Structures are given as structure tokens and as C-alpha cells.
């Protein structure tokens, strides 16, 4: 007979965990309503069933990286040509989300959720990924907030303004973005190993909300998701199996869960048909995650000095490789009968400078007109103030049609070649580009370490993608001693030059944020981490993974089973 030994700690509450599951995050009675034994059992079932598949997929990523670092480049897979050439379609788009012309995104914070659902956008993507610093508090409060949002009871009292926020009668449709496959959840151990972050995000949200969501949001479908950071269709296949497993557990029809996949890695652009094929019963399209796509381009070609990017502000949708990526996504999605979603407008209204504000809004207007004329069915905005401009651009072109899936001429996707998708972007590299990367990267990381994953910087709403671009571009420029040719200096980037830039930019940051905020924030710690990342001999895959342990806070295990 096995004995159960309890370690006595008076007045310490514990989560009611099933066998093999240890919750190492802080106990809170509110969190306990999310971390029920039944919900944790469901997450554990997902983890045990799919962890082997996830580990294999991550090893395949590492093997692909080794090939690219040895000189190979991504391309279309000859073995799946039959899928690309085949005459097949994804399941019909649910009526509840046929019209997605403007979507707003943001972290799973309580006030943000209310404002976004009330914003007038068609969809709100609530984010557990790049717009959220995945601390235990942020994650668990996010689940509490989403549960309250789905059942309609969510409110927020802003004491500083003495204002209570609540949901309108008509709200945006809710999509949720879990983390990518590569990120762990170190506060929940399953059979002694950290759980897979996205399975925790998906599992807890689905378990608590699927029934109510299908009544109030999905008209019999749902829940709805966004899936990030995939590099290959095998990763989409895992998600499809997870969805089928969840539908079976819930006793709902196969194909109820629907997801849009972000095409935000360079390898994935060659796998779009295959990704849709694996998710064909659960897909509602693809999205141009263009900022992470630029990050992925640099990371994929980290060992290719002939493929260095110019200043990141010059890598827009006018570059041939970016325009080709967008066009291929549109043609692929419409051929398969699903949404082709456009990219993020990250601008923030500039309230104290009307002239600068109008210039910023004009950039948004032109970008959204370009998207809708190209054939996109909808677009993203980071701020509610941008929604009217985005809506005007799409409605002005689409009229009353909910989307352009059938109305836009389906041009042949095969006309876009590997060469189009890999064409080296043009533009200059400047000292100011190095400075901006450094200044933004350090400030974003400082905010992330203190719990903020969505950060307003220089009139843009930045998330982890910006810090990633800044980091990998600095690393590549230092690694290859790039000549800065855009400002007439003609100097080469070195660790010494970068060190001087870091010192000067830290002084600038201190002046901009003020001495008190600089002293009390984590700017010095962020500076050390960012500098280390930019000057390391080997490039880490993800900044958020490399620094994750700095926000993990374990609490004692109170019950041991021997």
C-alpha cells in the first residue's frame, strides 16, 4: 500500500490538482475557479497525448535551422505538390464570422477586453502571446477576464476616473490567440515537466467557455482562435488533432472550433496550402503577421551575409518579397474558400500634435486601401482610434459584401515563385537604424520584465515582434560588420560601436522616461539582457524564451505523493 505524505504548512491553500499535475504558481481563490481539478485534468490529457508530437515538431524546426545555417534556403516541398495543385476547399466559413473587415488586437487585460469588444470592430483577438508578458498573474487573470467576457458579466471600475466599464449589447466576435508551440508554462508541471504553454492557454479557455461561447458568440460554432508562429504543416496537424480531441471531450460537432493561422515565419509561407489542408475542417483563413515575418526572415538567413536587411523601417509591404507574400496568401486563401487577413496597423493617435497625427492616419489609410484592393478580406488595428479609418477603407471597396472570398478574381498562386518570396530587400543601413533598434528593444524588454507585453513607443503600439526584429537585426549587423551606408558615415558595425550606442541610448531613454521611472524600472536589467542577446556567438531562437525564467515565480509544493 502506498502512503500519501502531506507536508504541513498551516494556512497555505493549494489547488485541487489531479495526479501528476503540480501547480507551482501563487494560489488565489479567483484563480482556483479556473484551475479546477476537471480543467487541469483536461489540460493534462492534452499534454500527455500530444507532447511527443510537439517535441518532434520542435526537433524538425532545429533540423531545418541547421540546414539554413549550412546554406540551404526554404522552398516549396515537392512531396506535397499534390496538395497545392489539388481541387479541394476548406469547410464553409461560419456565418457568425463571415464579416471580419476590421479586427482589433490586444492583451487579455480586463479593461482592454471590454474596450475592444465595444470598439466597433468586427473581431477582437484577445492575446496570450506577443502582446502579453506571460507571468502567472497575467495569464490567470486573463483567463478569469475571458470567462467573465464570454458569460457577459465582465465589468471594470477605473478608480482614477471613477468610471465603470461594461459590455455593450452589440460586441465584436472573440478570437483567442494562445502562445506558440515553443513556449513552456513553467508554473504548471505535468509528470514532472513544464506544460506546453499553448495547450494550457487553449485547454483552460476551451474547457470553461465552449458551451456559453457557442450560445452567445458563435451561433452554434466556436470557440474561435488565432494560431501563431507555425513553421510547417505538421504543426498545424497537431492543432487539428487537439481541436478534434477537445470537440470529442465536449460532445460537440467536428469542425465546431475554427482558427485562423498567422503566416509569420518564412518557412510557413511555402506551406500555406498544406497548413490549410491539415486544418481544412477547422480553418477560417490565414493572416499576414508581417512584423514577425520580417523577424523570421532575418533569423532564417542569420548565416547568409548576402541577405542582410536594410533599416527595419524600410522593410514595408512595398518590398517585392513582402508584396509577394501578401499576394500568395490572398490567392491561396480564396482558392480554398477562407479569409485572407491583412496585417497590423500599429499606429497610435497622436493627441498633442494634429499635423503628425494626420500624417500617421494617412499612412494607415493608404496601407488599408492597398490591402483591400489587393484582395484582403479584413485587417488588424492595434488601437480603437484606427477602426473608423480601417472600416472606411474596407467598406468603401467591399460595400455590403462580408468579404472578398468569392468576389475577387482568383489568380493563379503558382505564378508567385520561390524567387519572388526570397528576393533580397533593398535599402540603406544607418546608424539611426541601429540606434532605433537598440532604444526600442531595451524599452520593450524592460516593460515585458515588469508585466507589460503591449507597449506604446514613439507613437506605435509595440509587441514582442518589434523587440525580436531589433534584436536579430542588431545581432546580424554586428556578426558581419555591416557598413552603415545610409548616413554618409561609412563606418562598420562592431561590438565596440554597439557598446557606445547602448550607452548613449540608455542616456536618451533616461531623459525620455524620467529619472524616477528609469531608476524604479528594469531598464538596466533589460539593457544587459538585450546587449547579451545582440552580441552572443549564437543567435537564440526567441527572446521571450531566452528571458522567460526571469518572470517565473514558483511557490512551494504543499502535497507530495510518494
Swiss-Prot record:
UniProt gene name: MLS
Keywords tagged on the record: Glyoxylate bypass, Glyoxysome, Peroxisome, Transferase, Tricarboxylic acid cycle
Function, as annotated: Does not seem to be essential for lipid utilization and gluconeogenesis in seedlings.
Source organism of the structure: Arabidopsis thaliana (Mouse-ear cress)
Family note: Belongs to the malate synthase family.
GO terms under biological process: glyoxylate cycle; tricarboxylic acid cycle
PANTHER family noted in UniProt: MALATE SYNTHASE (PTHR42902), MALATE SYNTHASE 1-RELATED (PTHR42902:SF1)
Gene3D superfamilies listed in its UniProt record: Malate synthase, domain 3, Malate synthase, domain III
Active site: 177, 463
Protein name: Malate synthase
GO molecular function annotation: malate synthase activity
Species lineage: Eukaryota, Viridiplantae, Streptophyta, Embryophyta, Tracheophyta
Motif (Microbody targeting signal) on chain: 560-562
Record bears the keyword Transferase: yes
Disruption phenotype annotation: No visible phenotype under normal growth conditions, but the frequency of mutant seedlings to establish into plantlets with true leaves is decreased under short day conditions.
Coiled coil: none
Cell compartments where the protein resides: Glyoxysome
UniProt xrefs under CDD domains: malate_synt_A (cd00727)
Recorded catalytic activity of this chain's protein: glyoxylate + acetyl-CoA + H2O = (S)-malate + CoA + H(+)
Keyword Transferase among UniProt keywords: yes
Amino acid at each position: 500500500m502506498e502512503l500519501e505524505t502531506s507536508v504541513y504548512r498551516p494556512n497555505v491553500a493549494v489547488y485541487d490538482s489531479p495526479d501528476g499535475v503540480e501547480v507551482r504558481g501563487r494560489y488565489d481563490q479567483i484563480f482556483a475557479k479556473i484551475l479546477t481539478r476537471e480543467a487541469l485534468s483536461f489540460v493534462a490529457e492534452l499534454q500527455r497525448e500530444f507532447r511527443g508530437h510537439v517535441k518532434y515538431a520542435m526537433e524538425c524546426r532545429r533540423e531545418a535551422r541547421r540546414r539554413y545555417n549550412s546554406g540551404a534556403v526554404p522552398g516549396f516541398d515537392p512531396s506535397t505538390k499534390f496538395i497545392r495543385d489539388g481541387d479541394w476547399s476548406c469547410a464553409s466559413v461560419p456565418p457568425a464570422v463571415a464579416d471580419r473587415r476590421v479586427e482589433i488586437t490586444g492583451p487579455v487585460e480586463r479593461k482592454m477586453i471590454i474596450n475592444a469588444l465595444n470598439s466597433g470592430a468586427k473581431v477582437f483577438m484577445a492575446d496570450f502571446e506577443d502582446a502579453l508578458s506571460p507571468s502567472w498573474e497575467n495569464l490567470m487573470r486573463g483567463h478569469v477576464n475571458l470567462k467573465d467576457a464570454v458569460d457577459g458579466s465582465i465589468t471594470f471600475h477605473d478608480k482614477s476616473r471613477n468610471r465603470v466599464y461594461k459590455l455593450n449589447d452589440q460586441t465584436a466576435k472573440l478570437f483567442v490567440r494562445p502562445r506558440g508551440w515553443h513556449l513552456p508554462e513553467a508554473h504548471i508541471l505535468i509528470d514532472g515537466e513544464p506544460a506546453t504553454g499553448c495547450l494550457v492557454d487553449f485547454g483552460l479557455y476551451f474547457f470553461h467557455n465552449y458551451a456559453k461561447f457557442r450560445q452567445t458568440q458563435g451561433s452554434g460554432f466556436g470557440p474561435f482562435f488565432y494560431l501563431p508562429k507555425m513553421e510547417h504543416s505538421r504543426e498545424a496537424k497537431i492543432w487539428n488533432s487537439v481541436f478534434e480531441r477537445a470537440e470529442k471531450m465536449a460532445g460537440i460537432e467536428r469542425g465546431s472550433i475554427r482558427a485562423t493561422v498567422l503566416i509569420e515565419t518564412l518557412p510557413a509561407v511555402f506551406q500555406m496550402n498544406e497548413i490549410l489542408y491539415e486544418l481544412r475542417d477547422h480553418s477560417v483563413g490565414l493572416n499576414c503577421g508581417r512584423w514577425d515575418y520580417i523577424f523570421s526572415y532575418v533569423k532564417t538567413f542569420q548565416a547568409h551575409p548576402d541577405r542582410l536587411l536594410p533599416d527595419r523601417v524600410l522593410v514595408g509591404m512595398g518590398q517585392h518579397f513582402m508584396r509577394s507574400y501578401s499576394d500568395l496568401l490572398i490567392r491561396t486563401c480564396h482558392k480554398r474558400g477562407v479569409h485572407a487577413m491583412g496585417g497590423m496597423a500599429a499606429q497610435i493617435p497622436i493627441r498633442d500634435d494634429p499635423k503628425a497625427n494626420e500624417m500617421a492616419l494617412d499612412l494607415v489609410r493608404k496601407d488599408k486601401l492597398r490591402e483591400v484592393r489587393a484582395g484582403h478580406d479584413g485587417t488588424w488595428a492595434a488601437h480603437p482610434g484606427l477602426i473608423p479609418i480601417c472600416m472606411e477603407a474596407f467598406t468603401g471597396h467591399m460595400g455590403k459584401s462580408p468579404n472578398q472570398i468569392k468576389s475577387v478574381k482568383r489568380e493563379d498562386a503558382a505564378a508567385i515563385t520561390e524567387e519572388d518570396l526570397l528576393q533580397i530587400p533593398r535599402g540603406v543601413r544607418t546608424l539611426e537604424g541601429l540606434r532605433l533598434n537598440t532604444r526600442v528593444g531595451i524599452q520593450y524588454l524592460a516593460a515585458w520584465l515588469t508585466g507589460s507585453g503591449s507597449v506604446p513607443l514613439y507613437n506605435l503600439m509595440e509587441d514582442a515582434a518589434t523587440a525580436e526584429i531589433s534584436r536579430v537585426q542588431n545581432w546580424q549587423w554586428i556578426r558581419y560588420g555591416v557598413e552603415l551606408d545610409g548616413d554618409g558615415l561609412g563606418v562598420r558595425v562592431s561590438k565596440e560601436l554597439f557598446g557606445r550606442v547602448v550607452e548613449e541610448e540608455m542616456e536618451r531613454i533616461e531623459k525620455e522616461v524620467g529619472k524616477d521611472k528609469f531608476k524604479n524600472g528594469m531598464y538596466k536589467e533589460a539593457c544587459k539582457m538585450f546587449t547579451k542577446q545582440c552580441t552572443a556567438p549564437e543567435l537564440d531562437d526567441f527572446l521571450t524564451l531566452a528571458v522567460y525564467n526571469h518572470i517565473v515565480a514558483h511557490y512551494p509544493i504543499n502535497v507530495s505523493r510518494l
